[in-house]
């Protein structure tokens, strides 16, 4: 996979302010505010920054946490994981492997078959409905 690299100013020019703050500055959207939190549309969720496929809607579940949750990424190489010790917590941050956009965090409290919960900011995603 070829990495996409842009300056912060280039990202700022192509993203809206909330997308920029979350994807490029690692902010978090307010819980229950994202457009994909409750959607049930069948399709594939892509990175808003680079259009890389990230999650299949078949792995989405209602975790009640206020952000879209998935139990697995679309592929083993779709994202990278980074230890996050911000805000006095120890978590695992997930980023798009192609463009390094901050997506959210992964937690070990999800459903079978993986036991994982990828807690992802809606603003980082673009849902492409399945035809």
UniProtKB/Swiss-Prot annotation:
List of catalytic residues: 119
EC number: 1.8.4.12
Residues annotated as domain MsrB: 8-130
One Pfam family in the UniProt entry: SelR
GO MF terms held by the record: peptide-methionine (R)-S-oxide reductase activity; zinc ion binding
InterPro entries (UniProt xref): Met_Sox_Rdtase_MsrB, Met_Sox_Rdtase_MsrB_dom, Mss4-like_sf
Any single Gene Ontology cellular-component annotation: cytoplasm
Necessary cofactors: Zn(2+)
Binding of Zn(2+), residues: 47, 50, 96, 99
Catalysed reactions, semicolon-separated: L-methionyl-[protein] + [thioredoxin]-disulfide + H2O = L-methionyl-(R)-S-oxide-[protein] + [thioredoxin]-dithiol
Annotated GO biological process: protein repair; response to oxidative stress
Keyword rRNA processing: no
Record text on cofactor binding: Binds 1 zinc ion per subunit. The zinc ion is important for the structural integrity of the protein.
Keywords tagged on the record: Metal-binding, Oxidoreductase, Zinc
Annotated family: Belongs to the MsrB Met sulfoxide reductase family.
NCBIfam families recorded: peptide-methionine (R)-S-oxide reductase MsrB
Protein's recorded name: Peptide methionine sulfoxide reductase MsrB
Gene name per UniProt: msrB
């Amino acid at each position: 996979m070829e990495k996409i690299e842009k300056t912060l100013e280039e990202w700022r020019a192509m993203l809206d302010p909330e997308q920029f703050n979350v994807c490029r500055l690692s902010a978090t959207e307010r819980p229950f505010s994202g457009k994909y939190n409750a959607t049930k549309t069948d399709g594939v969720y892509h990175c808003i920054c680079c259009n890389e496929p990230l999650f299949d809607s078949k792995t989405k579940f209602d975790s009640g946490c206020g952000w879209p949750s998935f139990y697995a990424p679309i592929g083993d190489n779709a994202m990278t994981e980074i230890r996050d010790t911000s805000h006095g917590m120890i978590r695992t941050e997930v980023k798009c492997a192609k463009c390094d956009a901050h997506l959210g965090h992964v937690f070990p409290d999800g459903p079978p078959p993986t036991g994982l919960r990828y807690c992802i900011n809606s603003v980082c995603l673009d849902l492409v409905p399945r035809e």
